[in-house]
Structures are given as C-alpha cells and as structure tokens.
From Swiss-Prot:
This is Salutaridinol 7-O-acetyltransferase. Acetyltransferase involved in biosynthesis of morphinan-type benzylisoquinoline and opiate alkaloids natural products. Catalyzes the conversion of the phenanthrene alkaloid salutaridinol to salutaridinol-7-O-acetate, the immediate precursor of thebaine along the morphine biosynthetic pathway. Conversion of 7-O-acetylsalutaridinol into thebaine is spontaneous. It is an enzyme of class 2 (transferase). Disruption phenotype: Accumulation of upstream metabolites, such as salutaridine, but reduced production of morphine. It comes from Papaver somniferum (Opium poppy). The gene is SALAT.
Amino acid sequence: MATMYSAAVEVISKETIKPTTPTPSQLKNFNLSLLDQCFPLYYYVPIILFYPATAANSTGSSNHHDDLDLLKSSLSKTLVHFYPMAGRMIDNILVDCHDQGINFYKVKIRGKMCEFMSQPDVPLSQLLPSEVVSASVPKEALVIVQVNMFDCGGTAICSSVSHKIADAATMSTFIRSWASTTKTSRSGGSTAAVTDQKLIPSFDSASLFPPSERLTSPSGMSEIPFSSTPEDTEDDKTVSKRFVFDFAKITSVREKLQVLMHDNYKSRRQTRVEVVTSLIWKSVMKSTPAGFLPVVHHAVNLRKKMDPPLQDVSFGNLSVTVSAFLPATTTTTTNAVNKTINSTSSESQVVLHELHDFIAQMRSEIDKVKGDKGSLEKVIQNFASGHDASIKKINDVEVINFWISSWCRMGLYEIDFGWGKPIWVTVDPNIKPNKNCFFMNDTKCGEGIEVWASFLEDDMAKFELHLSEILELI
C-alpha cells in the first residue's frame, strides 16, 4: 500500500493585509443580499494555483519567492476595489468595512513541487492555513491567503474566501484581479492603471435581492442547510478522490446523447458539464441503497440568466441550486423514449437513455431560472428557505442529497502573476461540509473536466466501481 506523502511545512509569517487607501465613509456598511444570507460564514472555499519555477530564475538566486512583497502590495491595491473582503461580518445582515484586513500567510514547504503533485492523492490540505482546514476554528477574516514556497522555487498560492460574501464567479474575479495587478505592477504600470478595469466588481446584489429580517435571527438561520458549524470528529470518515474526464470520452458520450435528444432540445448540444453531471448522477443512482432516491442539487450562476443580464464581475453570491432526480421506477418511461427502447436494446442504450432523461430534466429546472420573473422568484424563494437542499422525502421515498458546483470556463488557468500560467488549478474538497459533494473544474487543456468527489469511505468505493463500469459500458 502506498504511503501518504507528507511534506515538512513551516509557517514563516502571518500578516494582515489592508486596502492601500481607506474605504470611503459611505461604503463602511456593506449590506448582504438575500442569497448571501443563505450561505454559512464558516465555509471557506480554497482555490490553489501551482506555478513552477521558470527557466529564467530556476538557476539563479531570484525566484518567485523574491516577489512576496510585490504580491502583498498588489493584494493591498486589489482590496481597494474588493473592500467588503477586508471587512468583518455582523449578524448575517452586513459587512463592517473599516479595513480590518485579510490574513496572509507565508509558508515554506520542504520538498519539490513535482514530488508533491505526483502523489495519487495529493495532500492539498497541507497548503491551507490551519484555520481554514478546521471548520470549528472561529474566524474573523473573510479572506485568508497562503503563499506556499517549495524548495525548488515553485509556488502554490491558496486563496480561501468565505462563501458568505462570494460565489465561485466572484472568487475567480478577485484572484484574476489580484494577478493582473501584480503583473502590471511588475512591469512598471502606473498606480492608476494597475487594476484591469474589466475586473473591478460592481455591487448590486443587495438591491436586486434585498436581505431578509428573518434570516438575521438564530431561528431563521437554523432553516438554512449547513447553517450550523460542523464538528471536527475522528468518526468522520469522509474521503475525497479526484476523477478526470478527458475530452475524448466526453465527446464520445455527447455524440451518442445528441442522437437521443428531444426535438425541443436538438439545437442545444450537451455541455461538458451536463455530460459529466449525468455520469455522476447515474453512478450515485447505482450506488444508492434500495428504498432511497438520489437528488442532485446543481449550482447555477444567475448573472447571465437575469433580464437584463448582470456583469460577470457582479460581486457576491449570485447563484442558486436547482434540483434534479429520476426515480428508478420512471426512468426511461416517457413515450418518446419508449419508441426507441425494446426488449432487444443493449444495456448501454438503456444507460444512454437514462442519461438523456436526466439531462432533459436538469435543463428543464435550469430553464425555470431564466424564465419569467415569477419562476425565478420561486426558485430563489425555495433556495432561501432551504427547501430544495433539505429535501427529505419525495413521494414517500427517502432522499439522499448530492451537491455539485462547477468552476469550468472561469478562466482560472489564465491567471498570470507574471510567472506564466499555472500548471494546475484545483479546489481543496476536504473543507466541511463535504460529504456527497462534487467540485468540477477544467483540466489544463480546457477541454476535459476534473472532478473532486467526497463520500464516506464505503460510499466512495461503490461510486468509483459504478463509475468505471458505466464509462466502460458506454
């Protein structure tokens, strides 16, 4: 049995980084939106970007580590525009923006980046601040950054942002803005031109989705899934594993599914995310014990689905989850599908029809988000009440809930601090709550999808077995 790789980790320093200029008095109170209120304060999402030592500096005394002061100064400039991130949370209603600052760790990793990354189960938690790894540790800073410096000159930058104030799109915008500011500062750009104007956020979520008084009280918050801080216990046997779906396999499945699509969806080719989501659903369907029904909750970015659409740089949580499921007794029983399935159908065709049905249902639920205003309001109401994510039974059948979040097409592999593009970008899946959760991200080529899956140990073994069987079958 392979031994778990463990690098010696030494925390060199911890600092507080504040905005370069004070936040104006009229911006000192940043109101949360209704959607912000629905996310837990303790849940931080760590994004890790790996940058190898470049050829130009790998043989000399200068390397990425010499840029630490530049990283800090550019981060300070970036916080001027992302000022709520440097504030402190008050009573699930607003952020006190008196420039309290974010936490910044400088860490030395004894070993080479290539050795660290070559492990079958990469120990990503070693690159995170301890206060992020443990959900039960109280935190004040809404953003925690750790710069990990390897002996070889490579660097892994970990940015952890509280989900209370930011979704995946906002987290991506923040890191891209910081990198752009660093790169421009390195080349001698003027202070006024340091930040890419296209990456300056807009703050309109609270006006679009006003906060709820109900969600400021303990009783109101208790209705929201994940609102209570999870305990760190030795009994928690949740494990995480990385799965990579390459472009060739995704394309093969997509072409087979396209033939089956109903007429009203023919013009909409399945996306990579839809294909992989359907494969995940089918695998958990096979892994789910008899008498239970798996329900998949998929995060949906509202920005482009609003009327009129919002900017990509709109700050905050502008995402909801939509829920999709297919009871085993009704899978592949629609009239359209019955015409093509008969007693001689191969098992692979049956599975493809099931994937087709699931994608059709998921699209139908997502279409409600971008439909009329009333439909969108109902989706948001269900999300804010915790109804969708806390489903217990459907038609008297016990439900097992699964959550999927996609970071695809967010430009994470384009993030350049002046060292070139990262060789790997990933999300640490081990932050609680993580049981039955999936994180999707692009592979480096931009065509495949990397998935981090988290299950209890026994469930992981079942999921892995069934996923491999399905991929081999179709």
